[in-house]
Regions:
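Short beta-strand-to-turn element immediately C-terminal to the catalytic PLP-Schiff-base lysine
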Residues: 113-114, 127-133
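PLP-dependent aminotransferase class I/II
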Residues: 48, 52, 60-64, 69, ...
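Structural signal for conserved beta-strand scaffold positions within catalytic alpha/beta enzyme cores
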Residues: 35-37, 113-114, 223-225
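Structured loop/turn residues at beta-strand edges in well-structured enzyme cores
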Residues: 7, 56, 105-106, 122, ...
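Adenylate-forming
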Residues: 123-127, 190
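PLP-dependent aminotransferase-like
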Residues: 2-82, 86-91, 98
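Short amphipathic alpha-helical segments
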Residues: 111, 125-126, 231-235
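Conserved active-site segment immediately N-terminal to the catalytic lysine
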Residues: 89-123, 138, 169-172
């Protein structure tokens, strides 16, 4: 899909508050990062400033759902509608959150999730990427394993048809990949914890409700305004 192909120097809009992993991959790929300030109430994009920041050079808006709190995706989609702009999601802190009954991480072309040990579920290290774009799916599958073709279908969207020679395809590399495959133990931990995710999020929401009820009238505190249904990665 030519519309999803970026080149060095393309402009990506990001929120001014996030974890470093939101920014550094963009920098490493030579993309131009433009910071937009956050809304002090939601801690996500200040939507008026986001709209003002978009120019004809903008190719991507990267939405970060901070501390479990969804962005207002109705507003973001209205801002980028009819523009050649890709929406991506950093959903590493918001697994299980919803906006208009839709899971965060599924509004953009791709959504990333973290399973670091301090997150909603843990495989100690690791994460998940979701996409409904088959070409991106195949690219990601190859990138996670050195850029090889072993895990691609015979007819694929990255290279020519794979050979029936298993030896050849075992040592054929077509992308500048990484080695980020999970260990079986990590995968097993993740599979079991996903089963518990509804309970985990339910308990976080109960705890957050208690904090809100206890602290909402404190004159020195401003509590993060919930958009949609937060999964409460943290309380701020």
């Amino acid at each position: 899909n030519p519309k999803l192909r970026l080149k060095r120097g393309d402009e990506v809009i990001v929120p001014a508050v996030s974890w470093s992993t939101t920014y550094y991959p963009l920098y490493q790929y030579g993309l131009k990062i433009k910071f937009v300030d956050i809304d002090i109430e939601t801690l996500n994009y200040d939507l008026a400033q986001l709209e003002s920041a978009i120019t004809n050079k903008t190719r991507v808006v990267l939405a970060v759902n901070l501390l479990g709190n969804p962005n207002d995706f109705d507003c973001i989609n209205n801002i980028i509608r009819d523009k050649d702009i890709i929406l991506l999601e950093d959903n590493c802190e918001s697994m299980g959150a919803t906006f208009n009954n839709k899971k965060t991480g599924t509004f953009g072309v791709m959504g990333t999730f973290s399973s670091f040990y301090s997150h909603h579920i843990s495989t100690m290290e690791g994460g998940i990427i979701v996409t409904d774009d088959e070409e991106l799916n195949q690219i990601l599958t190859s990138l996670r394993s050195h850029g090889w073709t072993r895990d691609l279908p015979v007819k694929n969207l990255i290279c020519d048809d794979k050979s029936e020679d298993l030896l050849e395809e075992s040592f054929r590399f077509v992308l500048p990949g990484y080695n980020v495959r999970p260990l079986e133990l990590e995968g097993a931990l993740g599979v079991e914890q996903v089963k518990k995710l509804p309970m985990i999020i339910s308990e976080r929401r109960k705890n957050a409700k208690l904090f809100v009820e206890t602290l909402s009238n404190h004159s020195d505190l401003l509590i993060q305004k919930e958009v949609g249904m937060s999964s409460w990665f943290g309380f701020s």
